[in-house]
Amino acid sequence: QPSDERWMIDGIGTDSPKLVKSAGRNGSASKLESWAEAINRVTAASLLDETRQKVRDTFAAFLGPALESRIPFAATYGNHDFQCGILADEQDDLYREFAGCMNPVADSSPLALEPGTFALPIEASDGSGRITMSVMMVNSGDYADTADAGDGNGRQSVTEYAKYAANSRGWDLADSDGYGTPSPEAVEWLKRVQRELGRRNGDGQAVPAIAFQHIPPQEFYDCLREVPAYTPNAVEGAREFAGHCYVLDRDVCRPGSRLGEAIGCADVNVGEVDALREAGGYFALFCGHDHKNSFVGHVHDIDLGYAPTCGFECYGPKSRFRGIRLFEFREDNPMAYVTRMLTWGDLVGRYSSNELRVFFEDHCVTDLIGVRNELRRPQVSATLLGAGAVTCGAIGYAVRGLLRKSQ
């Protein structure tokens, strides 16, 4: 039987069509395929251009207050950023279109490793040029998938890009091997950059530094205390920590700390906190990711802390607990920093304009762990018990009425 690759029908529509051997690709088919490919390229390019503009508009919206006040800003990346179809390296370029962006070009200096991983040294106010402290931004990755890792410079591999582009909005925790981690290069860079800052100061000493990233490392669980499953307000751990229930360890956490959900860390520990301790100088690591958490604990000789969600377009705590975290540093002793939450409740009021939505966001559950966590909340359990009692009473009353009628 002839192969479709080498044979074609000649004379279609005539009295004597025949099968002939093709010397190459069918000219009409090739033209049709070329036309289709060109259309696809144009469509994909236009869609990406539209997406880029949407990303620009989004950046402009949340950067608005900083831009209007001419306040410099820097950004790193979380596990959902890529799901718009524009990856971190290109988002970095888009950020730099805005005045005041301090994100450096990846690999442009020893202080800039990759998109979202870089150092921002702060010099003394006396004009000496001495670095008094540094802010470190760390790209903590998105989802674990070692087979499709990037090239270590923040430039995603072709395979990874294809997977993201094919179904970027669908790629999530359920499709991966857990949450991501900083790259091995980033963990090593956290040590190396301290040596570079010490070299620039001329004394070789690590400078006081605070790090910011999205996904927390496993050591954040060390700020918690394991308790029995029936403990009120306890939360069950996630993934590798599932089956264990926790509350805040008040002995290590600052006053005002809140634990609203499980710590969503990676399944593996890549030694980031150990690297911070080994490098010296690092006094704090703050993360986001878990929308309901806003605690600060001191373990492993370093502060580990959270800021919760500040908006109302996703799940989170009650309106009054949503907000941003403010930091204040003293030049003479940056390690003695002050941090506090600026919440919606403090700045605006107890309630938002859509409390029904906030209620569902606060109580949304997606699995059995979420159900169990909700049942540990005293208000929820009391409401369910009350509703159950009323229901049982109503059923009992109805049954009693039926029995009376039957007598």
Residue ranges and their predicted role:
Residues 1, 37, 41, 72-77, ...:
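Structural recognition of the beta-strand scaffold that forms the well-ordered cores
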Residues 2-5, 44-46, 75-87, 143-146, ...:
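Active-site environment of divalent metal-dependent phosphoester hydrolases
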Residues 9-42, 48-203:
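Extended active-site neighborhood of metal-dependent phosphoesterases/phosphodiesterases
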Residues 85-90, 148-150, 221-226, 318, ...:
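Short aromatic-enriched loop/helix-cap "lid" or pocket-rim segments at secondary-structure transitions
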Residues 119-127, 257-279, 291-378:
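Binuclear metal-dependent phosphoesterase catalytic core
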Residues 134-136, 151-288:
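His/acidic metal-ligating clusters that form di-metal
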Residues 379-403:
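Hydrophobic alpha-helical topogenic segments used for membrane insertion/localization
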Residues 406-407:
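Cytoplasmic C-terminal tails of single-pass
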